[in-house]
């Protein structure tokens, strides 16, 4: 089944060219199907890139998905055109009286800030509070996962000695849980972050379950036991060249940056990256949509 997005959204033609089933709203409305309503709070600077990455994964399931893109009202993006934001994005004020099957809160390159110092922190708190009653299941990604753990459970983030940067191996702790159904015993995830959360802080919260961890990158996948909240410290949605772009961007700016680990062939930046995480990315999003959202949400959203 398709993902339902506006035909003029840049991701529409990109995904259609990849043979991902996309459908415009006029065609979707002619079908007698209740689509899953998913809202994406996009906090990343380049919103078009991020929305395309996420829609690619959401569009590869048997379920019809209707997407709402959300931006912050209290902070204006400097890397995405105002025309794009006006055409395709809503604010929390527009949706606060609605209910959704799923919510995705993306990462944001603001790890150096305390949560309370983030320009849109109060607005983000409103969205996370809204998710308790108006969303069936929420997926938090990278900084979004740290923000969610902090807001809901008071779990702080800590700076790392060096940037966690590259593709890292993770071990599954519970092969029977549905969110990782079909996963291999070990799987690879891209990471790009300067902060982390501590295992002990998560273990002190009975509602939380650690599902996957890396010896080198730390905790990767955490969920509430009712799967209402999923927290992912990495970026399974990343494309082949995303870390490459970050690496050369930082080099061009004269920043001290290590070569991303386990990413370029032979660890040589002159070689192409090797994609080793794509299958598990699709599987995680498919499992989330099926087991945490579709199987749990009411047919009629109130």
UniProtKB/Swiss-Prot annotation:
Recorded family membership: Belongs to the MetA family.
CDD domains per record: GATase1_HTS
Molecular function (Gene Ontology), one example: homoserine O-succinyltransferase activity
InterPro entries in the cross-refs: Class_I_gatase-like, HST_MetA, MetA_family
Biological source species: Ilyobacter polytropus (strain ATCC 51220 / DSM 2926 / LMG 16218 / CuHBu1)
Pathway membership, UniProt: Amino-acid biosynthesis; L-methionine biosynthesis via de novo pathway; O-acetyl-L-homoserine from L-homoserine: step 1/1
Catalytic reactions of this protein: L-homoserine + acetyl-CoA = O-acetyl-L-homoserine + CoA
Family annotation (PANTHER family): HOMOSERINE O-SUCCINYLTRANSFERASE (PTHR20919:SF0)
UniProt-annotated binding residues for substrate: 163, 192, 249
Record site: Important for acyl-CoA specificity: 111
Domain of life: Bacteria
A Gene Ontology biological process term: L-methionine biosynthetic process from homoserine via O-succinyl-L-homoserine and cystathionine
Keywords: Acyltransferase, Amino-acid biosynthesis, Cytoplasm, Methionine biosynthesis, Transferase
Protein encoded by which gene: metAA1
Main localisation: cytoplasm
Catalytic-site annotation from UniProt: 142 (acyl-thioester intermediate), 235 (proton acceptor), 237
A cellular component annotation (GO) from this entry: cytoplasm
Function, as annotated: Transfers an acetyl group from acetyl-CoA to L-homoserine, forming acetyl-L-homoserine.
Compartments, record wording: Cytoplasm
Gene3D superfamilies, alphabetized: 3.40.50.880
Residues under site feature: Important for substrate specificity: 192
E.C. no: 2.3.1.31
The protein, known as: Homoserine O-acetyltransferase 1
């Amino acid at each position: 089944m398709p993902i339902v997005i506006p035909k003029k959204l840049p991701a529409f033609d990109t995904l259609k060219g990849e043979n991902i089933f996309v459908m415009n709203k006029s065609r979707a409305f002619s079908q007698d199907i209740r689509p899953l309503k998913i809202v994406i709070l996009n906090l990343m600077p380049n919103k078009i890139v991020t929305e395309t990455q996420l829609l690619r994964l959401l569009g590869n399931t048997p379920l019809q998905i209707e997407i709402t893109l959300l931006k912050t009202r209290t902070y204006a993006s400097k890397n995405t055109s105002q025309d794009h934001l006006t055409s395709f994005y809503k604010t929390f004020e527009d949706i606060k009286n609605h209910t959704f099957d799923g919510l995705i809160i993306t990462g944001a390159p603001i790890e150096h800030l305390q949560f309370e110092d983030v320009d849109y922190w109060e607005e983000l708190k409103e969205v996370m509070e809204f998710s308790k009653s108006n969303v069936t299941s929420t997926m938090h990604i990278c900084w979004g996962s740290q923000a969610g753990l902090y807001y809901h459970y008071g779990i702080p983030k800590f700076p790392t000695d060096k940037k966690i940067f590259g593709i890292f191996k993770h071990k599954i702790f519970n092969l029977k849980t549905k969110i990782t159904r079909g996963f291999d015993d070990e799987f690879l995830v891209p990471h790009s972050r300067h902060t982390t959360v501590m295992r002990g802080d998560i273990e002190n919260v009975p509602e939380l379950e650690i599902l996957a961890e890396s010896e080198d990158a730390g905790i990767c996948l955490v969920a509430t036991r009712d799967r209402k909240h999923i927290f992912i410290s990495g970026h399974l949605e990343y494309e082949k060249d995303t870390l490459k772009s970050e690496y050369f961007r930082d080099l061009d700016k004269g920043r001290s940056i290590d070569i991303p680990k386990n990413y370029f062939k032979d660890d040589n930046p002159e070689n192409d990256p090797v994609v080793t995480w794509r299958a598990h990315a699709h599987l995680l999003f498919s499992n989330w949509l099926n087991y945490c959202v579709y199987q749990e949400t009411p047919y009629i959203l109130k």
